[in-house]
Amino acid sequence: DIARFEARAVRLFRRVMPFVRLTSSMARRTSIDDRFFFKGAPAVIVVIARGDIDGALAASNMELMAQAHGLGVLYSGFFTMAARLSRGLRRELGLGRKQKVVTALVLGYPAVRYRRTAPKEAAAISWK
């Protein structure tokens, strides 16, 4: 099913990209290959909800749990956009009339292992 969903989304993006490239320099630098949305990952969680807040909170907890188990997580915002644009993709995902794709979490074991986090400046926090 993952491959079928991705293939449908790729077809949609390939159809609309010529128009998007007219106004977006980022789109002009982007090529849409067959693995554009899910990057060949072994698992994808498509978060479906009636409202954005509930779905986003659920996705955030899923991300934390996946990372706690050593998985890497990528939010595929482009797949979310494709699902919102394509009635056929929504139908294929089995969405009800009041449901929508809030996000898609692409899961897999990271190909790299970081030795440390990126350096960050201390946050300026004031309590009142």
Outline where the language-model segments fall.
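Generic alpha-helical secondary structure signal
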Residues: A3, A7, R84-R87, Q99
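Small-aliphatic-rich amphipathic alpha-helix that forms the alpha element of a beta-alpha
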Residues: A43-E92, L105
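N-terminal start-of-chain detector that recognizes signal peptides
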Residues: R15-R21, V73-T80, G96-Q99
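Solvent-exposed alpha-helices and their adjacent loops that cap or buttress functional pockets
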Residues: F36-G40, L93-K98, A118-P119
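Glycine-rich, charged/polar anion/phosphate-binding loops
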Residues: R29-I32, L89-E92, A111
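Residue-level signal for pocket-adjacent positions within structured domains
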Residues: D33, R84, R90, K120-A122
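C-terminal helix-cap and adjacent tail motif
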Residues: K100-K128
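Glycine/small-residue-rich phosphate/adenosyl-binding loop
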Residues: D1-I53
